[in-house]
Amino acid sequence: MAFDASGFTALEITESEDRVVARMNRPEVLNAIDQTMVDEFHALCGYLERTPKILIITGVEANEEAGQRGIFASGADIAQLRERRREDALAGINSQIFSRINRLPMPVIAAIDGFALGGGAELAYAADFRIATPKVKMGQPETNLGISAAAGALWRLKELVGEPTALELILAGRILNAEEALELKLVTELHEPSELMAGAHALADRIGKQDPLAVRISKRVFSMPRDAHPAVDELAQAILFESQAKFDRMQAFLDRKKKK
């Protein structure tokens, strides 16, 4: 059964056999992440946890003729954030949904154009893959607003780019351009805005050629703490060694080798 997004207002959902595209669509506020968007992401995650598929998250597409610049997400909705208090912070409104996205069974791709700032950047960090356009700007301006980057940047960012650069972004307000993000491997590919989604789908196609169960288990094991290895690797391999896909794919490989 396909996902029902008929009541959605912040996300536009497109679904195919092996993937879902979630396009954030609040251009009037630069795709600020508000409670409605968070709720819609939670509903989508519930579906993807039950029906594992690749997820591509993107924002408003650039349209030069209409004067529309590309926007991933400019951060949390400041109007809502201004009114949040201690109990809201302890509830982890944004951090909880970003962690849920990160834990989805199948890989998540962030296709980023324009601003990915604050919570928008933290959403991108939660993805397994990040590709972008030459117009991307990524950073953490939270301390300038009197708060901290508490939805993932304080721990994910140093794992992604190293502690010195992470501190520059978090404590000194550094904003990365596309070339810097690519050099730091924060993004792995750059595409022109008109080719960004084609690049995201090409990456999804490569993932889709792999065995889905092997991908799911490998993603899960990859995120395990160091002390869990190698025991968790061996248990995961034991599961895969009994899968029909393992026998079918290895036999197909051997058959191709015989023909050469």
For each predicted feature, which ranges?
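A short acidic, glycine-rich active-site loop
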Residues: 82-92
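Crotonase-fold acyl-CoA enzyme core
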Residues: 3-11, 99-212
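Hydrophobic alpha-helical membrane-association signature
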Residues: 37-40, 93, 196, 233
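Hydrophobic alpha-helical segments typical of transmembrane helices
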Residues: 93-97, 153-156, 165, 217, ...
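C-terminal alpha-helix plus adjacent terminal tail
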Residues: 1-17, 48, 61-67, 173, ...
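Phosphate-coordinating loops and pocket residues in cytosolic domains that bind phosphorylated ligands
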Residues: 32-35, 74, 83, 171, ...
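A structural preference for short, pocket-lining loop segments at secondary-structure junctions
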Residues: 17-25, 36-84, 100-110, 129, ...
